[in-house]
Amino acid sequence: MKLAISNIAWTNEEEADVAAKLQELGVRYIEIAPTKIWSDPTKATIEQINEYIEWWKKYDIEIVAFQSMLFARPDLKMFESSELRDETRQYLADFLRLAGDMGASRLVFGSPKNRQRGRMSTEEADDIANRFFSELGDVAKQYNTMLCIEPNAPQYNCDYITTADEGARLVRAISSEGIGLHLDTACMALAGDDISKSIQDNGDILKHFHISAPMLDRVYDRDDVDYRAAADALKRIDYSGVVSIEMRPGEHGENVKRVEDAVSFVRNIFE
């Protein structure tokens, strides 16, 4: 298991202090929201990309995953029209290329509002999603990356693929080496999933994992998420991928300590 943390957990102004703390703690991997770095990441130059990679290398940290690709594009939709779907697919394909350039082998597709199906039947949505992700899986393989589908709970305004079982069924139906399953502790807890069973039933397709709390609250020992069940299940399936802490930042100036506390808690439970 490789421990990472997402860069959404601090402000840009705190990044150097957080990076130094992560180096001190021996955290060697980071997940990034590219939209936090560049206004349009798909237009980042190779010079900008290399500069960012090298900046983290100074702290012995490697970029291993992307998230929040559609954060700045609420206009892009999977199910609204074929034109918007094509535009969404191309935009995500550009992120797959960027991930390949940056050495990030996993991209988390959450984006609950971009995949709302509304009145569309589940069967029709499944048919569209299968073709949509199959094509992106081919692109992912081209760039030695993998797009990981994240079941998102209804509390996050998601109405398509809201449980771990639904996510697993879609990934198995797509059956692409470029598409994997991503699970998230908060999403599973909110959706009422059996966390242990969801992980153990899907060890063969589980390719990325988030340790989070509902509404991206601070990660600590809490009653609403069974982190110990998740940790035990990951050990049972001999999970060797990335486990990434995902939480929103607190007040400016307090996030170095929040990151340190979260890393300490997660290591105590998951390692």
Predicted stretch roles:
Residues 16-17, 57-58, 75-180, 190:
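Active-site acidic/histidine proton-transfer and metal-coordination neighborhood
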